[in-house]
Amino acid sequence: MLFSCRSKAKLLALTLLLLSAATWLYLSVGETEYGQSLGPVAPRFSATPSFQMELEIRLREAKEENRRLRQQLGEVRNEEQSTGGGTEGDNSSHCEHRSLTEKCELIHVAIVCAGHNSSRDVVTLVKSILFHRRNPLHLHLITDDVALRVLGNLFNTWMVPSLQISFYNASELKPDVAWIPNKHYSGIYGLLKLTLTKALPSDLSKVIVLDTDITFATDIAELWAIFKKFTGEQVLGLVENQSDWYLGNLWKNHKPWPALGRGFNTGVILLLLDKLRLIGWEEMWRLTAERELMNMLSTSLADQDIFNAVIKSSPTLVYQLPCYWNVQLSDHTRSEQCYSELADLKVIHWNSPHKLRVKNKHVELFRTLYLTFLEYDGSLLRRELIGCPSEGEQQGGSQATLSQLDEEDPCYDFRRESVASHRVHLSFLPHLTPPPDPYDVTLVAQLSMDRLQMLELICRHWEGPMSLALYLSDAEAQQFLRYAQASEVLQSRTNIGYHVVYKEGQLYPVNLLRNVALKNSHTPYVFLSDIDFLPMYGLYEYLRKSIAQQDPAGSPRALIVPAFETLRYRLSFPKSKADLLSMLDTGALYTFRYHVWEKGHAPTDYAKWRTATTPYRVEWAPDFEPYVVVRRDCPEYDQRFLGFGWNKVSHIMELDAQEYELVVLPNAFIVHMPHAPSFDISKFRSSENYRLCVQALKEEFHQDLSRRYGSAALKYLTAERNR
């Protein structure tokens, strides 16, 4: 009777242990016969030459037997690796050797990703792969326009070493599958995996194909190594389906597509692309689909139905992967038969429409594993840990800039963080692009987690489009997602773009956040506000009318919206300018920062505004920092200014240098709501070095302004010296 690989391994290991113990006992007894133990510090009596020779011979024999048993144990493990995969009853990964993949072999992974939600899901999948991987990766992403914009920017700012990204336009592949009726919730994108032999480069010979709802619990190189086990006509590596779907017994009159036994799940696929092309894969799946659709009328599980119909007709095409490479958490799963302990898990597949809410007796364990990567700091994955050459395109210029900085500089933190690369996830939640309108305006602002409560309030005051940059950690981003999905107010809005900038460093990158929100607005005009301000009711329509009254051929204008503030957390918000003036007179409202930074808004000329009925022009003055409406193509904010101090002042100065007219709107206002001091303003007030660094950055900004605008910028230097 032949032993299984596991039995052989256990027997040899036990034999090796017993032999070692016997050798030790023999030597101990031999020494004890001469009245001496083998203690390392005790003096030894001289043994007779014949006994010593016999002892050495037996010791050499024991060592040789030990070596031989170790060699046999290794051979059993190698034999196990070459024969253990792909058997239906193999539910444990203990006997599987680690990857045979070469250390720096490039692993190719293909993923179909479309829309805002799928773009979020794929990030968690990629994190789990990157966390475990030890090889360079090349991701092939088949995307729609939304996912291309979101993921293209995310990976460009993520800058992970030894990671290449290629994008493929899903629109060019849709005609190949659009004729197939599909009832699956993934829609037409759930069929695109059928087209990968056409979509991917012709010189790419093999690829791992993954759904976006996959989580890896091991090194993907182990899965890649299984390609070497393919033999004969095998071109597809798949795990058996772990529900009774294809057996047709889930409910009365259930008629599934044809499948081999339980069928196979296509959440994880190994594709031998070169062989698939040789056997005419495109024609094969198309003819099979046409034949089956005559009876089935539509697919229920998208591409999976067609893959299974092909395998039913040609079973030699499939290599059955061990089930732990796709532990399926569907509504009718039997996946618990696939693992006995955590070490058995390789890949978790959340293939139920209910996702994390699926019913499974071990779902808490799986959910914890998933949440680990969902909230994992993606910046940590930038570190080069695999010892393979990185692709040049993933190395940002910021690294070269950082290496040139002087770490002894008292302002080193400011300079380092001003050039740091932050991961940016655009359009974190679904939203619609506003229809073209020459007078439309987007409210632009930035915030951190502690200002999240302002979102619903602003939504009640501003009905127009918004572009908001949120500075969050990976974990906070998920808290924001849950908050937004639970808010009826936010869910009712489809014209708000939320753009997550992930935390990096200690200083708040306020101007980077403003630039992200500014560049990702989609209207001709923007209202550059801050999150702590509530717009007056009707401000959106008033600004549109004010923009329409401008002379399009005239000089560029910055329309100033006067700012006020209240110290009361509960405020009866003014419904008109008359109400606001009354509240000013009673002390319920004040002009913004009149008591701590009066010159920041004094040039607005509040006395004139009280009685103004038409827009009026004002002149620039030092430290002026109003909130303005400008064209979207205005100058960006200077990102050297971080935290507190001069971040808006520098922007208004540049608008003036570009000869923008500063015009105050007579019937517009915003009100600043009270909040606790930010961390950065506290540091500005308490740290002399912080203030000195802000001053140094101001001087450098003045010099740069002079270089760009020449003599026109002299007045700013003069004003600075006369302060």
Swiss-Prot record:
Residues 73-95 are annotated as: Disordered. GO terms for molecular function: glucuronosyltransferase activity; metal ion binding; xylosyltransferase activity. It is found in: Golgi apparatus membrane. GO terms for cellular component: Golgi apparatus; Golgi membrane. One of its GO terms (biological process) is protein O-linked mannosylation. Residues 32-723 are lumenal. This is Xylosyl- and glucuronyltransferase LARGE2s. It comes from Xenopus laevis. The gene is large2-a.
